[in-house]
């Protein structure tokens, strides 16, 4: 087959502009306990499993043994924000709709947990066949397990799909799964790789033709 069969989307920072929600609630949580959490601290957590983020927050709050409780509270706050309003990244919804109209399959692979995606589900278009969250795997991103699971569910080889990712850990996971990756960096610069193209302008100026052409170039370079 010489046509793109599936798009595998990251969620936070790629499909949905939820990073301001995460960063805002992280800052509020730490401030409520007299600690400090800077933009740089928040950006370092982009793409990490929420458990790792929560442990860093707990330490900033001087509550290093309360990582699980902090994680539960952080997820609850962000889920409420997403449930109230889910802002798509510029160009993302249009790209998803164009892909659906062209019968290109789509799914979501995220480092967020099921509570976040449950809050988002009602606002997602029906184009997405399934969602894989951090709760569905033993080893979250940057481990390739989540992307390997997505490829098995799609029953497609990695070269017939394109992975959209914004973070260092997410793109590393996609590449480790053998995927062809299009990086759309938001807060973290991405390192070049033979199987990754980087759209520094994000998806705002990207249409389906550009994505398919890029996928084909990556595939042909294999």
Task: List the predicted regions and their residue ranges.
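Conserved phosphate-coupling serine/threonine residues in phosphotransfer and NTP-handling enzymes
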Residues: 14, 110-112
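Conserved phosphate-coordination/catalytic loops
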Residues: 86, 90, 111, 141
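Asp-based, Mg2+/Mn2+-dependent phosphohydrolase catalytic module
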Residues: 1-5, 97-100, 104, 113-222
């Amino acid at each position: 087959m010489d046509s793109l069969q599936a798009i595998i989307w990251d969620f936070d920072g790629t499909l949905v502009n939820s990073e301001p929600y995460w960063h805002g609630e992280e800052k509020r949580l730490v401030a409520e306990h007299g600690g400090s959490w800077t933009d740089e601290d928040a950006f370092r957590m982009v793409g990490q499993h929420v458990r790792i983020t929560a442990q860093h927050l707990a330490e900033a709050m001087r509550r290093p043994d309360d990582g699980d409780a902090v994680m539960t509270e952080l997820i609850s706050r962000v889920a409420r924000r997403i449930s109230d309003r889910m802002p798509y990244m510029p160009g993302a919804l249009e790209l998803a709709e164009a892909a659906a109209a062209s019968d290109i399959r789509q799914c979501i692979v995220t480092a967020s947990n099921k509570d976040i995606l449950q809050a988002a589900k009602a606002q997602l278009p029906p184009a997405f066949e399934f969602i894989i969250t951090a709760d569905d795997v033993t080893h979250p991103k940057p481990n390739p397990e989540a992307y390997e699971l997505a490829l098995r569910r799609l029953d497609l080889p990695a070269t017939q799909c394109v992975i959209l990712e914004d973070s260092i850990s997410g793109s590393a996971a996609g590449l480790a799964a053998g995927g062809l990756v299009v990086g759309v960096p938001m807060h973290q610069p991405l390192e070049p790789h033979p199987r990754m193209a980087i759209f520094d302008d994000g998806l705002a100026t990207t249409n389906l033709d550009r994505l398919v052409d890029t996928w084909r170039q990556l595939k042909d370079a294999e």
